[in-house]
Amino acid sequence: MLDRRIALRSLAQPRFAVLRYPAGQPPHGSANESPGANVEAIDLLIDARWVIPVNPAGRVLEHHSVAVRDGRILAVQPAAAAHAAYHAAERVELPRHALIPGLVNLHTHASMALMRGLADDMALMQWLQDRIWPAEARHVSPQFVYDGTLLACAEMLRGGITCFNEMYFYPGDAARAALDMGMRAALGLIAIDLPTAYASDAEDYLAKGLDLRDTLREQPLLSFCMAPHAPYTVSDRTFSRLLTLAEELDLPVHMHVHETQDEIARSVAQHGMRPLERLRRLGLVGPNLIAVHAIHLNKEEIALLVQNGCSVAHCPSSNLKFANGFAPVTRMLADGVNVGLGTDGSASNNRLDLFQEMRLAALLAKGLSGDARALPAQRALSMATLDGARALRLDHAIGSIESGKLADLAAVEFNVPDMLPCYDPISHLVYTAGRENVSHVWVAGRLLVENRELKNRPKNDLENLIVLWQNRLSMETKA
């Protein structure tokens, strides 16, 4: 391991190189040279200026290579040692890049990408009741969800996001889009005590969700969460049924919690207690809970989350845009709550950009605490990767660059004027880099973004879909 405070040297090297070899031809020496007896055949070798594994925290490996076989990381080694040890079918040279784990978006509503900018500068409940719910009633369909999720996946992949935790209607169509794009998704099996075009009542939501899980449970890119929308839209009876299913199936429970002061006031008026206390009494506060937003928490509620091993999905941009308040992230982290980062949906953010969320989370923590050391860059990066994976209970497979884990990876280019000079790559990733600096993305070892271009879906297809939906939804902007 080398010191993180490294200055960029000459910029004369190429931005990247991809070396592909015909079957049976070794990637070293002449075409007639055979690999040595101790050389191991692999699918992919990625050489990077810096490999940032995230675990251990703060480590930066200079001039290292990541060896990949069958979609998994086989080894992380100094480049010279890796070149001697492995016979790679493909080698990618990234001499001016940092290789990081693929980012994990811990909370989003992917297909709402089609509603980006539809209704801005409004408080949450006005936004929902006056604009979003009516628009959803008129437009949301399986095709809406499929097309919107395609658009969201394209945006997320180009920004280094390789896994997203989804909560929306028609999750099967979201799954289809994610699989078509080659992206990893945790599908929320949504439950709400309101009829929609997707389901007539809570039992219908749950039945459809369970059928979907049974159908897709063997898909390696998919996992599942129970996804009750929020305490103010789900009844005690539905929560009890959902808890039983979550325990039987061992699934996380992904839900909006304590997002606004109004939500809390209405819960006290209706139930005689704050939402988190109600959830505790119903048995839902436990290690499976992913509490989204979690803005208005007192000390006792933070302690409750800690004691029960809960996770929080922190969505700073969405929280600010709705003027909902400031989540006590510094206190949660200090006390031991696992906190990941989410974008929320495009209709409320309006970007699916975890680089933005990392930077904003770190800056807000410093400004609100009055402590410049609060939420350092390495912790922000962990929140966007390993901590999000941990909340989804996928940290055994993704979230860090370690032998045995899936090769969900993103490369960030530093060889551009706005990224120079660089003394500390991790600091640069959080305070300087943007998603526009992401050059390559792999999911399970499969290259999905190369030199900033999507490999899997023609750009003009997405543009045509966007135009069609924009024409249909344009009437909503006049509401």
Regions found by a protein language model. Name each.
Residues L2-H64, V68-L74, A79, A85, ...:
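Active-site microenvironment of metallo-dependent hydrolases
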Residues A98, R116-G182, Y205-E218, V467-K478:
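Alpha-helical scaffold segments that flank or form the walls of functional sites
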Residues L103-S111, H254-H256, H293, D344:
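Histidine-centered divalent metal-coordination motifs
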Residues L114-D147, R184-E203, Q261-N288, N308-S311, ...:
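Active-site gating loops and adjacent loop-to-helix segments of metal-dependent hydrolytic enzymes
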Residues D173-I295, E300:
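Metal-coordinating catalytic core of metallo-dependent amide/deamination hydrolases
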Residues R281-N288, T330-V416, T432-A433:
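His/Asp/Glu-enriched, well-ordered alpha-helical/loop segment
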Residues K321-A323:
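Helical hairpin unit composed of two closely spaced alpha helices linked by a short loop
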